[in-house]
Amino acid sequence: MEKNNRIKRKQNMKIYSLYRMLSLDRIFYYAIEFLFLTQVKNISAADVVLKSSFYALFMIILQIPATIVVEKLGTRRCTILGNIFNVIYLSLIIFSTNFEMLVLAEFISALCFSLKDISDTTLLTQSIPACSKKGEIFSKLEGRGSKNYYYINAVTSVLAGFLYVINPFIPVIFALLVTILATIMSFGFQEIENEELKNEDKKSRKSNISIISYIKELKDGFKFVIKSRRLRSLMLYSGIIWGAFCLISTYRTSLLKDIGTLEQLIAIISAIVGIASGIGANGLLYFH
């Protein structure tokens, strides 16, 4: 089994960075998202922001169920499932006709990332053999994928702006094709058989540990977070920053459009933001 696991680990580590580059987020899409929803789907700017609020709410609700699902189904299956949800999300965006369909799409998106945020990194962690440089290898592979995503996202953002002028559906369809490619790549991952995890699973079954007791442990964890001033501050800070980021990314495009900025220039500005994010991701890898 150990020899078989070595082959699986090599396979997973070989494709992870490329997979992460294509699946970290939606390439081609975000540069034209606001324009597509407001101009093509006739959704108001306020509703575009509101749908992001629904996404945040769904993510909070799904965190505990997603953890349980990953634990039950395994990291590989959940990674594949998350990417399939991503394909469904973009399909709903293309065919959406009203705000209610957008809310449904945001729920599907929350299903996607609540699973992927857990399963992707856990899959990589399990794929790296136990050694003194395990953390370094993880940071290198994860950082390389994230950095390359931001750079390729910058290039595709520019392309998306010019393609949007030709036909607004073209960049969204390209985003869907990239997501389908990432889904196909996710089938190449292998589940790592871990004897220790199997033994722990057997012990948990013998001791009749149920989902209810698991949720109780999480509640105890939340109580600890609430009592900790530092953790409360960290959660508040993260919430404010994330909310500000959503507002800025949405209203940036709205303001640029209101002052008569061309779609191509809006895409170029998004590309510059993407390049800055890539530099930041590279710096994070260096300092880590």
Placement of each model-derived feature along the sequence:
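Juxtamembrane intracellular "pre-TM" segments in multi-pass secondary transporters
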Residues: 1-10, 189-234
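Helix-loop boundary and gating motifs at the non-cytosolic
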Residues: 2-61, 228-273
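Residue-level signature of mid-helix packing/kink "hotspots" within the transmembrane helices
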Residues: 28, 56-64, 150-154, 158, ...
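Transmembrane alpha-helix termini and helix-breaking/packing motifs in multi-pass membrane transporters
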Residues: 36-40, 93-95, 150-175, 258-259, ...
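Helix-to-loop junctions at the C-terminal end of transmembrane segments
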Residues: 61-75, 164, 279-288
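C-terminal ends and interior cores of transmembrane alpha-helices
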Residues: 84-98, 102-103
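Cytoplasmic helix-loop-helix junction between adjacent transmembrane helices
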Residues: 107-150
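Symmetry-related core transmembrane helices of the 12-TM Major Facilitator Superfamily/SLC fold
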Residues: 170-188
